[in-house]
Curated annotation (Swiss-Prot):
Residues 1-5, 52-58 are periplasmic. This is Ciprofloxacin tolerance protein. GO terms for cellular component: plasma membrane. The gene is aciT. Keywords: Antibiotic resistance, Cell inner membrane, Cell membrane, Membrane, Transmembrane, Transmembrane helix. Residues 27-30, 80-111 are cytoplasmic. Induction: Both transcription and translation of this gene are induced by treatment with ciprofloxacin (at protein level). It comes from Acinetobacter baumannii. The chain crosses the membrane at residues 6-26, 31-51, 59-79. One of its GO terms (biological process) is response to antibiotic.
Length: 111
């Protein structure tokens, strides 16, 4: 059974107070970044543990492998986003060239 000593209770209460203070401050968006970072690190730990158990690697090499896989995935995501941004820019810059007639030319062609 886990026992809570005074230091653990004080530390967790200070973290809770800090989170509440940040939530009500103008820097609320930083909580999203913090949660995304914690989620990313959790996924990294899952990959590290899977690599360590599957290939029986030491902890150091499993961390290096997990970080390498994460960087490769981040690179692929960034390349995909860049390709989509370039495609959207090309679509915005595309101008369809249709003939423009002046009034005189339209009258002549209809006779």
């Amino acid at each position: 059974m886990v026992t809570a000593n005074f230091a653990a209770i004080a530390g967790l209460s200070l973290i809770a107070v800090a989170l509440v203070a940040v939530f009500f401050s103008p820097y609320r968006r930083w909580l999203g970044f913090m949660l995304a970072g914690m989620f990313f690190w959790g996924l990294l730990e899952v990959v590290r543990f899977g690599v360590q158990v599957t290939f029986e690697m030491p902890v150091t090499y499993s961390y290096l492998t997990a970080l390498s896989l994460a960087m490769v995935m981040v690179t692929f995501v960034l390349l995909r986003e860049d390709k989509q941004a370039q495609k959207a820019l090309a679509n915005r810059q595309y101008i369809e060239h249709t003939p423009v007639y002046e009034d005189d030319q339209q009258q002549c062609s209809s006779r």
